[in-house]
Every structure is written in C-alpha cells, then in structure tokens.
Regions:
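Conserved nucleotide-binding/hydrolysis micro-motifs of P-loop NTPases
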Residues: 47-51, 74-75, 116-117, 148-151, ...
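Conserved P-loop
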Residues: 12-103
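Short, glycine/charged-enriched secondary-structure capping and boundary segments
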Residues: 29-30, 56-59, 84, 124-128, ...
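Phosphate-binding/switch region of NTP-binding enzymes
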Residues: 147-182
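Extreme N-terminal, non-catalytic leader segments
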Residues: 1-13
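Phosphate-binding/switch loop-helix module in NTP-utilizing enzymes
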Residues: 78-141
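Hydrophobic/aromatic ligand-binding patch that stacks against planar heteroaromatic rings
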Residues: 33, 58, 132, 152-153
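ASCE RecA-like P-loop NTPase motor cores
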Residues: 12, 141-144
C-alpha cells in the first residue's frame, strides 16, 4: 500500500450497514474522534425521536462542536403498515436539513443516522441523496447508517462496512441495556 499524499486528502463517504448491531455506535465513535481532532460534527437521526437515547446527553459537553438532532418519531413501518404521512413529512424535513448542512460546508462531518431505512421504506429518493453527496464541498465527510444500504450509495461510497450478528444477548433473553445499546 502506498502512503497517501497530502493532496489526496478529501472528504469521505462512509456507510455502516448490515443486519448486525453497532452501526449508529460506530458512527458516534467516528464523530467523537472527529471532535477530538478539532472537527465540527452534525448527526441527524432520521427515524429515532420518541426515546431518550444516551448519546443525546453524551454529546452535550461538546457544545456546538457536536450537534445531535432526532428528526423522527421512532419506529416506522411496524408490522408492514403503510407509511404514515407524518413520518414522511418528518423524513422530508430531515433530508432538507441534511442536504443544506452537507452543501453548506459548515460541518466537517455529517452523520445521517438511519437514512438507509428511510430510503429502503421508499420515503426518500436515493438519487437525491447521491446527487447531494457528489456535489458536497471537497472536505466534508458523510456517514450513512442503517441496514440494506442502497446500491447507488454503496457504489459512490469510499468505505462500506457491513455489520453482522454473530451472537446477541437477546437470544438468551437479556433485554437491551441502557448505556450499552441505547
């Protein structure tokens, strides 16, 4: 492997996908690393919104350097239900905020948490997302999370990581643990 030259540095598109847990957690870890290196981070959660997750308080000490916004109402399309118009409206609002943030260049890293679900449920056009990612300022990094990443986004991404479950405590009847899984 050759050593990257300074002129080869650029903003990256990263995707955390797959059926295993840890996609959001990995993105948060990258966000923490970025803040530690003096970068500004915006994380928009497209689906989460009705629960109070630990990361909401975890980023508070970073002030304006790490902003996390829940944009949804929580679970959508549960049990094969039709898309609720309110959920669709919230995804559209989240996407517009994400698009403007990415294109503004005000953020070094923009994390689009659970965007793959919004795309997979037909709530957001993957072509719109791809176009914005390709038009972003050169040094803006973007992370997309959620299962079943769309093929178009995988194609344009620089790094794609697929999480897979090998073993999960839930299989032993152990419920999700606050501070570890939410």
């Amino acid at each position: 492997m050759t050593t990257p030259q300074p002129e080869s540095r650029k903003g990256l598109i990263l995707i955390n996908t797959g059926p295993g847990k840890g996609k959001t957690t990995a993105a948060l870890g990258t966000g923490l690393r970025a803040v530690g290196c003096g970068m500004k981070v915006l994380m928009l959660q497209f689906i989460k919104g009705s629960w109070h997750y630990g990361e909401l308080d975890g980023v508070l000490p970073f002030g304006e350097n790490f902003i996390l916004k829940q944009m949804g109402r929580g679970f959508v399309k549960v049990g094969g239900a039709e898309t609720d118009p309110e959920d669709l409206r919230l995804v559209e609002e989240a996407w517009e905020e994400a698009r403007l943030a990415i294109l503004s260049g005000d953020w070094d890293l923009v994390i689009l948490d659970e965007i793959n679900y919004a795309i997979g449920y037909g709530m957001l056009d993957p072509e719109k997302v791809a176009t914005t990612l390709l038009e972003r300022p050169e040094m803006v990094h973007v992370i997309l999370t959620g299962r079943n990443a769309h093929a178009k986004l995988v194609e344009i991404a620089d790094t794609v990581t697929e999480m897979r479950e090998v073993k999960h405590a839930y299989q032993k009847g152990i419920l999700a643990q606050r501070g570890i899984e939410f």
